[in-house]
């Protein structure tokens, strides 16, 4: 990547980066690396409603580090396992998502979270796509109502990989964003994950051109491989410059799998450009 083709701010996804450290030490590690802003997947992948003690420990770890928690996932199951990729569209697990909403938003209220990522989930055999989509619309509406109370946004993203995730393209995802907005929830936006789009064969540049006005957050990793920028073939500089030219001024989440240590994988990014 070149020196500075754009001025967008980068933040560290502490569920993918700094995994050399225990989860509660990662905010401090991100701060030591020069970041002032971070994001996390849901910290308890097996539990949508952790104990107050667990919640307080997480909040304290972020507070004490001095970094801003900008983004947090709602409960989505075990994302690194073979099955889970969100629960909000799955009838048998919908209640887990609903139970998680006030917990996640409560953490967000304490830490100033600006955006909550709501992973849609996979297609299941015991429900039709239409039934799943209707349930998802209802649950995303509930999430948006709760997030709105603290001035936050709900994000919806495409996901790639072998799991039968329902939203594969930018068009798939924008259709959901539009449906939730049409139901009266304006605080729902597109999470443009440039890696997932490329990995699914969607055109990231076309998605930027068509959907920047509905883009509420951006995440990057290089393609192929999902490594740090410079390890693949995506022209991330050009894509991010295009986003900024079209009016995007939010954060860029670094959600990649380091091919070396996290610190060494950040060599491409001068400390001064870390959010």
Describe the residue ranges of each PLM region:
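Short C-terminal domain-edge/linker segments immediately following a structured domain
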Residues: 40-45, 69-73, 100-104, 145-150, ...
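A generic structural signal for short coil/turn motifs at secondary-structure boundaries
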Residues: 47-48, 127, 162-165, 226-230
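N-terminal pre-domain/capping segments
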Residues: 1-105, 109-113, 241, 255, ...
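Active-site acidic/histidine proton-transfer and metal-coordination neighborhood
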Residues: 3, 64, 81-189
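Histidine-acidic metal/acid-base catalytic patches
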Residues: 1-34, 112-113, 137, 141, ...
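A cross-domain feature marking catalytic cores of carbohydrate-active enzymes
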Residues: 14-16, 40-44, 69-76, 118-120, ...
């Amino acid at each position: 990547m070149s020196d500075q083709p754009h001025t967008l701010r980068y933040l560290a996804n502490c569920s993918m980066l700094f995994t050399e450290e225990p989860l509660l030490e990662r905010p401090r590690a991100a701060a030591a690396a020069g970041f002032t802003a971070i994001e996390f997947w849901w910290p308890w992948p097996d539990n949508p409603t952790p104990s107050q003690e667990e919640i307080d420990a997480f909040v304290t770890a972020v507070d004490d580090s001095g970094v801003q928690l900008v983004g947090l996932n709602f409960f989505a199951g075990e994302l690194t396992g073979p099955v889970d990729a969100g629960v909000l569209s799955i009838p048998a697990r919908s209640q887990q998502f609903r139970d998680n909403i006030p917990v996640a938003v409560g953490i967000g209220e304490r830490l100033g979270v600006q955006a909550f990522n709501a992973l849609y989930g996979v297609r299941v055999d015991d429900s039709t796509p239409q039934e799943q989509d209707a349930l998802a619309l209802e649950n995303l509406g509930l999430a948006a109502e709760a997030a709105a109370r603290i001035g936050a946004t709900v994000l919806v993203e495409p996901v790639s990989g072998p799991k039968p995730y329902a939203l594969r393209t930018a068009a798939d995802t924008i259709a959901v964003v539009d449906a939730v907005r049409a139901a009266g929830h304006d605080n729902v936006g597109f999470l443009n994950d440039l890696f997932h789009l490329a990995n699914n064969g969607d055109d990231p540049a076309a998605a930027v051109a068509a959907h920047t006005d509905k883009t509420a957050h951006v995440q990057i990793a290089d393609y192929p491989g999902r490594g740090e920028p410079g390890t693949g073939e995506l022209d991330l500089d050009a894509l991010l410059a295009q986003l900024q030219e079209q009016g995007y001024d939010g954060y860029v989440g670094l959600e990649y799998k380091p091919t070396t240590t996290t610190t060494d994988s950040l060599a491409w990014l001068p400390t001064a450009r870390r959010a």
